[in-house]
Amino acid sequence: MPILDTPYASLDLIRQPEQPNEPLQAFDAADEYLLATLHGQGLPAATRVLILNDSFGALACALAAHVEVTSSGDSHLAHLALQKNLARNDLPADRVRFVPASEAAQGPFDRVLIRVPKTLSLLEEQLIRLHDQLAPGAQVIAAAMIKHLPRAAGDLLEQYIGPVQASLAVKKARLLSATPVDKPAPQSPYPTRYQLDQPKLELLNHANLFCREGLDIGTRAFLPHLPKALGAIRVADLGCGNGVLGIVYALGNPQAELTLVDESYMAVQSARENWQVILGERPADIRAGDGLAEQPPGSLDLVLCNPPFHQQQVVGDFLAWRMFTQAKAALTKGGELWIVGNRHLGYHLKLKRLFGNAEQVAATPKFVVLRSIKA
């Protein structure tokens, strides 16, 4: 793997989830540009640094031995990458404090370093939280590859922080430096809510949720065809988002034992709050995790899944394939995986290869609902 050479450290970094013959590296030119700029400015050892959305820990690992670092983001996989990369580079784990994006970091901070996320509502929520977290003279710097830097990111920095200065481009990366000014305390528009018609439910969604303003069309295609199995079976909603699949299934099967898991901390927080409002004190295991990686083998009877096909800006079916293989391992003999996916992604071929069978349960012009049974 390529080495990240910075003025602070040379780092051997890996991505998460790990893939054989990984074609992508765990850092980019925006990380390099940001670290070089910080070094040029000077960074005293007493500097309190907050890093937001550090995908695989490149920024935190580079600075860990030099300043006080807090890292915050919405990805459990990013947190896992940070832990592994600290260990891989012989850096003490306690040099970096990690705070899930579902919680507020505790300032004040002298420098805030932001990797601009794909979802600008997440960036907006993070900037709103900075209102009372900045020390006098603090500086906020956002970094991105130019192809992933929308104009709206600069507008949000100016709206919530202060005047923005854009850097020159270096290796197709750009920095946006914002100078904090006094502003009235902003009101967050998050979480948002939408109404579900069948069944009639109101669902809450924190800032980084996919299809935050309404039910996504894949889930809409899946809900009428959820399995009708009843009784005390063990069911997982894999990649649960706001929990809608697991919650609707649980309403139809009062005896089922539910696990809802997602790698997004804000998704898990949304699912917990929705479960509490709709199902009250009914027990459920709702957690952030690397899919079903920590689920005991043979411990589930049914897995429901609407798999993602991107990780940040990277598009591919590697996450779906990983979820399918995890589901197979976690299912008991005769257990079933039910998924919904875009027709063009060809998930039926992957499921048939993995399980030896794949049945089309339902279809729309764009989506298919598929079922595979573990032999």
UniProtKB/Swiss-Prot annotation:
What GO MF terms are annotated? 23S rRNA (guanine(1835)-N(2))-methyltransferase activity; nucleic acid binding
Q: Keywords of this protein's UniProt record, alphabetized? A: Cytoplasm, Methyltransferase, rRNA processing, S-adenosyl-L-methionine, Transferase
Record carries keyword Protein biosynthesis: no
Listed EC numbers: 2.1.1.174
Q: Where is the signal peptide?
A: none
Signal is among the record's keywords? no
| Top-level class of the enzyme under EC nomenclature | transferase
Give the catalytic activity. guanosine(1835) in 23S rRNA + S-adenosyl-L-methionine = N(2)-methylguanosine(1835) in 23S rRNA + S-adenosyl-L-homocysteine + H(+)
Q: Which family does it belong to?
A: Belongs to the methyltransferase superfamily. RlmG family.
Role description: Specifically methylates the guanine in position 1835 (m2G1835) of 23S rRNA.
- The protein, known as: Ribosomal RNA large subunit methyltransferase G
- Species of the source: Stutzerimonas stutzeri (strain A1501)
